[in-house]
A protein has these predicted regions:
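A mobile, often basic/glycine-rich helix-loop segment
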Residues: 74-128, 179-190
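Conserved SAM-binding loop of SAM-dependent methyltransferases across substrates and taxa
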Residues: 10-26
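Conserved SAM/SAH-binding beta-strand->alpha-helix loop
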Residues: 37-39
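Conserved SAM-binding motif I beta-strand of class I
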Residues: 27-35
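Conserved SAM-binding strand-loop segment of SAM-dependent methyltransferases
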Residues: 50-64
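Long, Lys/Arg- and hydrophobic-enriched amphipathic alpha-helices
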Residues: 126-265
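Conserved class I S-adenosyl-L-methionine
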Residues: 1-9
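Conserved SAM-binding loop
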Residues: 44-45
Length: 265
């Protein structure tokens, strides 16, 4: 089979996965890594070259969508790193938050989601649908990712048949846009430091926003996917039998320790 990982980071998941497939006796025909960063691709190659399990697999690097294929697609913390829009509730309606310059510094600037924004169909359409039956207080700030429709459509064009697994930070829409979550979820990460000011060290920080999983399901459905559902990572791991695997690993470790003590007695 084939596995396509989108945004593979340093290659850690790829190396571990190939090791597990080898232990199970089901090696992959091809492991494709889609990453546009030359620096990250070099790190991934270095990591996989040091992995014995990767030696028998055709590891391929891509900087764009592959040719149509059948297999599994995996992405970890991918959707939350996509470009996002930010909005502010004012007088009971959402205003678009953009960026302005004030006294030589970058600042947030709010403007109505009509008039100049009237042609921005993605912004207006999403908020009209998402907030149709959700009441948010003035001053509330939130984020959403407008690119999900295009992304799933592109993925659907190359995936003939298979499964897509996406692990990300996020919540279903009603929980994400909760009236008490007034400052949104925009976060910035730089050298193991986290903060919420994207204007601090611009261009150096990784900017993320939590994912509206309801929007993910809607976009996937529009692109022709059948959505199996979404769950927490804890429930996913427990459902996959991680407790039994942990117990088996502990039993193996105990047997090994016992054999070692007998041998040295």
């Amino acid at each position: 089979g084939e596995l396509l990982e989108i945004g593979p980071g340093t290659g850690g998941f790829a190396a571990e996965s190939l090791g597990i497939f080898a232990l199970l006796g089901t090696p992959l025909q091809r492991y494709a890594l889609l990453d546009t960063s030359a620096d990250m691709r070099a790190r991934q190659r270095e990591r996989l070259l040091a992995s014995p399990a990767a030696q028998g697999t055709d590891c391929t690097w891509l900087d764009g969508w592959p040719q149509p294929f059948t297999g599994v697609v995996f992405g970890n913390e991918l959707l939350d790193a996509m470009p996002c829009e930010r909005f502010l509730m004012r007088d009971g309606v959402p205003w678009r938050l953009g960026v302005g310059l004030e006294a030589g510094r970058l600042v947030w600037r709010a403007r109505p989601a009509d008039g100049a924004c009237a042609g921005d169909d993605a912004f207006v359409r999403y908020l009209q649908s998402a907030l149709a039956d959700i009441s948010l207080p003035d001053g509330y700030r939130g984020e959403f990712h407008p690119g999900f429709d295009a992304w799933f459509a592109a993925l659907g064009a190359v995936l003939r048949r298979g499964t897509v697994l996406l692990a990300d930070y996020g919540l279903p829409r009603r929980q994400l846009f909760h009236p008490e979550r007034t400052m949104g979820s925009l976060r910035c990460h730089y050298r193991h430091r986290a903060h919420d000011d994207p204007f601090l060290w611009p261009g150096l920080v990784d900017v993320t926003a939590w994912v509206d999983f309801t929007a993910v399901a809607e976009s996937a459905t529009r692109a022709g996917f059948e959505v199996a559902g979404f769950t927490t990572q804890t429930a996913f791991l427990l459902g996959g039998g991680i407790e039994a695997q942990l117990a088996a690993a502990q039993a193996d470790a105990s047997d090994t320790d016992s054999d070692s003590s007998h041998a040295s007695a």
